[in-house]
Amino acid sequence: MYHAPETDGGRRDGPPHRPEPRGDHTTTTMHVDPYIVLGSAVVGFLVGMTGAGGGALMTPMLILLFGVKPSAAISSDLVAAVLMRPVGAGVHLKKGTVNRRLVGWMVLGSVPAAFLGAYLLHVLGHAKSAQTNIERVLGAALLLGAAAMVLRYILDRRGGNGRTGAIHEILPKPIPTIAIGVVGGVIVGMTSVGSGSLMIILLLFLYPTIGAKQLVGTDLTQAVPLTMAAALGALAFGHIAFGVTLSLILGSVPAVLVGSMLSSSAPDRYIRPVITFVIAASGLKYVGVGTTALGWILVAVLLAAFITWLAVKRPWARAETDLEGIDVTPHPEVE
């Protein structure tokens, strides 16, 4: 029964912890939160466009903005991802932008490794400390990877490469590709994050000529069984908030469909900057950057990226204009 004096007094005297939840985010209710639906739609669109950022953006959003308990936020995000990622993967499979052989080799390593990671987390004496340290290392790796992607973009533009969205034939390297799956699976099993962003960085380093559309499609597809394996652990041992999960599904599934349709048909030159931006944001969150600071940093990154784009584009455009004035028509030899 509701007693106004006791409730009001408790609310005044109790110390603030997280933001006051919007609605009932307990594990048993099915309340749909429209704000979570909207937020998950934004994240779902980014996941569909890039294949990355799901765990790094969705979970902090639930905890910091909506006051969901961390354990419930992680578990609910994983379960919702089981429906979200197959939608994006299906779009890319239909478009033919998935390297099925790469997916097979990666899954061969990632799914067993995900269970191994969950077991290691269970037996470690300082599990929370180990998880935090892993996330910090993962964040640093993602930031280095984002910087490498920017450098590669600059070099490609200077050299006149990477101006088409053609899908190149990628010959799988079985052992290194399985190793990528193992590394990603263990980290996902221990931290519940990194199934998309980490795999993208590792794939880029192993297969530097892979196209952006094929990169996103392959990453989304390999993440499906990996996310399912992690979600099984969440269902068995986690604390799922069913209302939060339903809200995430309602927002993210349609949005990831739209994002995947765009990423499977848009030119590479538009997709790669978005991938880099999302991976950089994920890396900053993993290393512990606060939400407000992250916002200002990302604004600065966008400004720097725009200035860099202007600096790189102008010489290339000028050279292209000069070439247009050159007569390349073959002439008969003069005897």
What are these language model-derived features?
Residues 50-103:
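Juxtamembrane transmembrane-helix termini in multi-pass membrane transport proteins
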Residues 46-56, 188-196:
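Short helix-coil transition sites and intra-membrane helix breaks within transmembrane domains
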Residues 74-82, 107-111, 216-224, 252-253, ...:
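Transmembrane helix-bundle signature of multi-pass membrane transporters/permeases
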Residues 58-60, 86-98, 185-189, 199-201, ...:
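Generic transmembrane alpha-helix signature in multi-pass membrane proteins
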Residues 43, 47, 184-189, 204, ...:
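Hydrophobic transmembrane alpha-helices of secondary-active solute transporters
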Residues 58-72, 198-214:
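Interfacial segments of multi-pass membrane proteins
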Residues 2-3, 11, 17-43, 64, ...:
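Juxtamembrane transmembrane-helix boundary motif
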